[in-house]
Swiss-Prot record:
Keywords: Ribonucleoprotein, Ribosomal protein, RNA-binding, rRNA-binding. Part of the 30S ribosomal subunit. Contacts proteins S5 and S12. This is Small ribosomal subunit protein uS8. The keyword Cell wall biogenesis/degradation does not apply. GO terms for cellular component: ribonucleoprotein complex; ribosome. GO terms for molecular function: rRNA binding; structural constituent of ribosome. Signal peptide: none annotated. SUPFAM superfamilies: Ribosomal protein S8. It comes from the Bacteria. NCBIfam families: PRK00136.1. One of the primary rRNA binding proteins, it binds directly to 16S rRNA central domain where it helps coordinate assembly of the platform of the 30S subunit. Belongs to the universal ribosomal protein uS8 family. HAMAP family: Ribosomal_uS8_B (MF_01302_B).
Amino acid sequence: MSTHDPISDLITRIRNAQMRSKSKVTTPGSKMRASVLEVLKSEGYIRGYATMEHPSGRSEIEIELKYFDGEPVIREIERVSKPGRRVYTSVKNLPRVNNGLGISVLSTPKGIMADHSARDANVGGEVLFTVF
């Protein structure tokens, strides 16, 4: 299946799986999705992920979702920059999500990273999505 916006597809799969209290969800594999998942894992929003290779040559990523007291750890996940309307920001104007309780995930020249990492590295970039 071809998707025009792989990040929105990933976010939607995570959101839908958590609404149904699934423990795992799979998504087509790509380097960008893996680096986004690495940020979510390091920030504690998912348990982990694993890349699986199929005999046909395509890869798939299995994501282990995280729950606390039966409730999803990710309360809100929202796409900011979309293919029709890209949102870029400088390091000075990086958005704070819920007064610092959530994170923004950015695509920067130094790779995909959370907003606090971008502030530390003094780089801006495209705001992909926010998580709370």
